[in-house]
Amino acid sequence: MGVTKKPDLSDPILRAKLAKGMGHNYYGEPAWPNDLLYIFPVVILGTIACTVGLAVLEPSMIGEPANPFATPLEILPEWYFFPVFQILRTVPNKLLGVLLMAAVPAGLLTVPFLENVNKFQNPFRRPVATTVFLIGTVVALWLGIGAALPIDKSLTLGLF
């Protein structure tokens, strides 16, 4: 059974502290130093303890040791680099491939300027941002799936 501290709401000093709102917790105590020095370290140390505990109790296998004398048939990057790898693999000019990769973040940076007059949060009322998101997602998935396939089937995904 735990003891909980109930605030005395009839106290005018406490009511004044609670009326201030931000910077105070439920009991009217200021966030500094109570919350920052006593609660946050417990949460941070608890998170670290859970992470270390999971790492000790369930260690994952690193994999087979590397052999410098055996090269795999096709070298594939990590899964999150598949779309970029596919761009570099399919574009004949490597400079054009690098420029296409640089065009992706540059294009994403222009979207807010194309639709700066639209202040709606509903995606159906923001057609430019929704269209850019949907086309970008489809292209990224298409390039990512194609990168895992052989080069002759990578652009058509083996469907045609």
From Swiss-Prot:
Pfam families: Cytochrom_B_C. SUPFAM superfamilies: a domain/subunit of cytochrome bc1 complex (Ubiquinol-cytochrome c reductase) (SSF81648). This is Cytochrome b6-f complex subunit 4. The gene is petD. GO terms for cellular component: chloroplast thylakoid membrane. The keyword Transmembrane helix applies. InterPro entries: Cyt_b/b6_C, Cyt_b/b6_C_sf, Cyt_b6/f_cplx_suIV, Cytochrome_b_C_euk/bac. The chain crosses the membrane at residues 36-56, 95-115, 131-151. It comes from Marchantia polymorpha (Common liverwort).
